[in-house]
Swiss-Prot record:
The lineage of its organism: Bacteria, Pseudomonadati, Pseudomonadota, Betaproteobacteria, Neisseriales. One of its GO terms (cellular component) is cytoplasm. The gene is metXS. It is an enzyme of class 2 (transferase). Residues 48-357 form the AB hydrolase-1 domain. Transfers a succinyl group from succinyl-CoA to L-homoserine, forming succinyl-L-homoserine. This is Homoserine O-succinyltransferase. InterPro entries: AB_hydrolase_1 (IPR000073), AB_hydrolase_fold (IPR029058), HAT_MetX-like (IPR008220).
Length: 379
């Protein structure tokens, strides 16, 4: 089947969980919702399910369109669908919006049952462990005892790794793409600067901006602009725009003059229109806190000692946000723990965002690995 085939029109589902969820910080959500989309069919043995975990600004809408009029497909439509690397003719694929998100799952935009008002800044801090715990509840709801694979890029890859550690018997394969076993100091610094842009916006109103009929648009816009720079290759913007001007000469002022300025402001404005600032704060802190080795004497090898999953790890040559060396740390730990791991470093000019793009070598590698996952489903 053609690589251009889509899953078509898809309908999200909001799954209610009328149960408490105790979070890593000791707080409890009395109940929670998870917004999901599914693609393909769960087989009779219920052993062909694949969980897709999203990155910082992702959500449940992985593939397809919500209507025929939709201009854009899901964020990983080139990866998930009939005849694609994660083939929905063979796998039952589940995408979800994580807790703390702003696309239907319980988060800052949800109603706090204790107050009858939106949580806003009162939504509790969540971690990758908390997400995986809620995803395990989702697996129970769907009747899935074991995922054929848990797949994610960037922050999604951290979730795939945490799944293999937290629930070793429930994951057969973990695909960790463009990720890291913990953030570097530089990455934490980037996240903090982004948060400060939001927190110091006069319209933030201590996180309760919606009750004041405001939005910290300036801060969120700057956070996204800065983040977008780091997701590209070192001189990705230079190759794309150079020093091209929007007009024939310098204007000698502070308005938008360079094409790169126009591009970044467009990206920032688009992001403000679809994302919540409190969610952005929560997601970046979840990134900062992720460090599974910390529970095992700061030994990543010990952290993966009990995993049962086989691993596929991929990095990209020009990704400096999650450099190949960070993937090497995980690969070396898995080898030291005598676990099964396949690794590929893809030559790409697209930086961190390469994991979202349709690179031939990358797609071929994921396809080959998922063929092995499919074979395991048939044993």
């Amino acid at each position: 089947m053609s690589q251009n085939t889509s899953v078509g029109i898809v309908t999200p589902q909001k799954i209610p969980f009328e149960m408490p969820l105790v979070l890593e910080n000791g707080k409890t959500l009395p109940r929670f919702d998870l917004m999901i989309e599914t693609y393909g069919e769960l087989n009779a043995e219920k052993n062909n399910a694949v969980l897709i975990c999203h990155a910082l600004s992702g959500n449940h809408h992985v593939a397809g369109r919500h209507s025929a009029e939709d201009k854009y497909t899901g964020w990983w439509d080139n990866m998930v669908g009939p005849g694609k690397p994660i083939d929905t003719e063979r796998f039952f694929v589940v995408g979800l919006n994580n807790l703390g998100g702003c696309d239907g799952s319980s988060g800052p935009l949800s109603i706090n049952p204790e107050t009858g008002r939106e949580y806003g800044a009162d939504f509790p801090m969540v971690t990758v462990k908390d997400w995986v715990k809620s995803q395990a509840a989702l697996a129970d709801y769907l009747g899935i005892e074991q995922w054929a694979a848990v797949v994610g890029g960037s922050l999604g890859g951290m979730q795939a790794l945490q799944w293999a550690i937290s629930y070793p018997e429930r994951v057969r394969h973990a695909l960790v793409i463009a990720s890291a076993p913990k953030l570097s100091a530089q990455n934490i610094a980037f996240n903090d600067v982004a948060r400060q842009a939001i927190l110091t916006d006069p319209d933030f109103n201590e996180g309760h901006y919606r009750s004041h009929n405001t939005v910290p648009a300036r801060g969120l816009r700057i956070a996204r602009m800065m983040g977008h720079i780091t997701y590209l290759a070192e001189d990705g913007l230079g190759k794309k725009f150079g020093r091209d001007l929007r007009s024939n000469g310098y204007q000698y002022g502070y308005s938008v003059e360079f094409e790169v300025e126009s591009y970044l402001r467009y990206q920032g404005d688009k992001f403000v229109g679809r994302f919540d600032a409190n969610t952005y704060l929560l997601m970046t802190k979840a990134l900062d806190y992720f460090d599974p080795a910390a529970d095992f004497g700061n030994s990543l090898t010990r952290a993966v000692q009990d995993v049962q999953a086989k691993f596929f790890v991929a990095s990209f040559s020009t990704d400096w946000r999650f450099a190949p060396e960070r993937s090497h740390e995980l690969v070396k730990a898995l080898i030291a723990a005598q676990k099964s791991v396949q690794y590929i470093e893809v030559k790409s000019a697209h930086g961190h965002d390469a994991f979202l793009m349709e690179d031939e070598a990358y797609m071929r590698a994921v396809t080959a690995y998922m063929n092995n996952v499919d074979k395991d489903c048939r044993l």
